[in-house]
Amino acid sequence: MKPTIPGEVGEKGHEIEAIIDRVKLGDKQAYEMIIHQFERQMYTYCYYILKNHEETEDAVQEIFIRAYENLHRYSRQATFSAWLYKMAYHHMMNIKKRQGRWFELIHQFKEQHPKIEITPTPQESVIEELLTYLTPEERHILLLKAVEQYSFDEIGDIMGIKPATIRKKYERLRRKLLDYKRNKGGIVHGTFAKSN
């Protein structure tokens, strides 16, 4: 069962829709309430894709700017958060494409300018290790399913892929992670043990 997304169900859902209506009518300050409501979710999602705090902050800001500019296109066929995640997904894919083009230059820069390493917590290390083992598409699916707990239908809508395909991809990546951790002698978090 999908947990309650703040501002998306019952009275709160109507509240978000009312705020969106105010923004569409020109109340720019009302948009700050939308940002406040969804900023943390967007940051978490983007960070696990980009793995860099500064890039994540920039990406989140760009996503909210694009959402504001395209709010007139939002139709209530999906929840606002699903619409926002769809926008975030496409933005992350564009960033990853750009990063791919500049990978060699960045790699050279990092070799010339080593940074001070901060020791991550054991849990952060496991998450980081698992995410680096996955493709960008698999990371998106995993984060939307296991962290944000969207249904396969919602993930399919966000990513523009059939829900049945998302389910198969999720099962494959789940098995991939389980095999990886078994081979490494570790334990995989219970979230990956079963799909819903």
Where are these regions (language model features)?
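C-terminal edge and immediately downstream basic/flexible tail or linker adjoining helix-turn-helix-like DNA-binding
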Residues: 1-12, 22, 103, 157-160, ...
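Short, charged helix-capping/linker segments at alpha-helix termini
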Residues: 3-10, 24-33, 43-62, 163, ...
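Internal acidic/polar
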Residues: 12-16, 94, 102-131
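Sigma70-family region 2
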Residues: 24-25, 51, 62-79, 98-99
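Short helix-capping/turn signature of helix-turn-helix
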Residues: 37-40, 48-49, 143-150
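Structural recognition of an alpha-helix C-terminal capping motif at a helix-to-coil junction
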Residues: 44, 58-65, 69, 78-90
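Arg/Lys-rich amphipathic alpha helix in sigma70-family domain 2
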Residues: 72-76, 86-107
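Helix-turn-helix DNA-binding module
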Residues: 132-140, 148-165, 176-179
